[in-house]
């Protein structure tokens, strides 16, 4: 969900000379690969239209979104390891769920989750010029948007809860901190000179 992750990762990449791997740039490819590998949620995302995706209950959407990231994570990990061979990497994306990071034994000081409050997300998504294209084909675009934001709010809540349970840093962005302040928080957490 929209929380400033990409902007923060870009700044960290430039500031510390790290490669930047943005999962969102590869989601279409991973979805196609997953569908070809008969992964159920990936197949759904390829086959379903906007109405079928966005007019569903947000709870079901959130559940599917979590499963989707679990389905494609092997592809992400494979690509991330290729990039990592070329030097240190900063990476970001909603796919980096705390339970997946724990399973991979990612140390607490090498992971931070940044999620938005629902109000922050809605206010920023309403400014995104591509949102109408995502909802194109929905019979009730306002309801579809509400469902989407509901899904992402549940998703963010799940990430925060998992972070607490697994002792990972969770930063909730309500817009109260500037991007530079958030960059400093993340840098300090990673033990990087601020």
Place the predicted regions along the sequence by residue.
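Walker A/P-loop
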Residues: 6
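Conserved substrate/cofactor phosphate-moiety recognition/catalytic segment
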Residues: 14-63
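ATP-dependent NMP and nucleoside kinases share a basic, alpha-helical "lid"
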Residues: 80-84, 91-137
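NTP-dependent small-molecule kinase module
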Residues: 154-194
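Phosphate-binding/switch loop-helix module in NTP-utilizing enzymes
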Residues: 65-86
């Amino acid at each position: 969900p929209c929380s400033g992750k990409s902007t923060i990762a870009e700044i960290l990449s430039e500031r510390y000379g790290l490669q930047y791997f943005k999962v969102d740039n590869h989601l279409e490819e991973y979805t196609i690969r997953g569908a070809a590998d008969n992964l159920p949620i990936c197949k759904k995302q390829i086959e379903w239209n906007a109405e079928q995706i966005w007019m569903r209950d947000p709870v079901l959407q959130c559940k599917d979104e979590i499963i989707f990231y679990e389905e494609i994570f092997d592809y992400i990990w494979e690509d991330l390891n290729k990039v990592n061979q070329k030097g240190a990497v900063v990476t970001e994306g909603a796919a980096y769920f705390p339970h997946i990071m724990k399973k991979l034994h990612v140390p607490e000081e090498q992971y931070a989750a940044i999620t938005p409050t629902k109000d922050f997300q809605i206010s920023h998504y309403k400014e995104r010029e591509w949102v109408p294209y995502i909802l194109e084909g929905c019979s009730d675009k306002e309801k579809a948007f509400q469902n989407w934001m509901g899904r992402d709010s549940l998703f963010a809540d799940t990430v925060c809860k998992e972070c607490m349970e697994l002792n990972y840093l969770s930063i909730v962005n309500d817009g109260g901190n500037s991007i530079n302040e958030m960059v400093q928080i993340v840098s300090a957490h990673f033990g990087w000179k601020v």
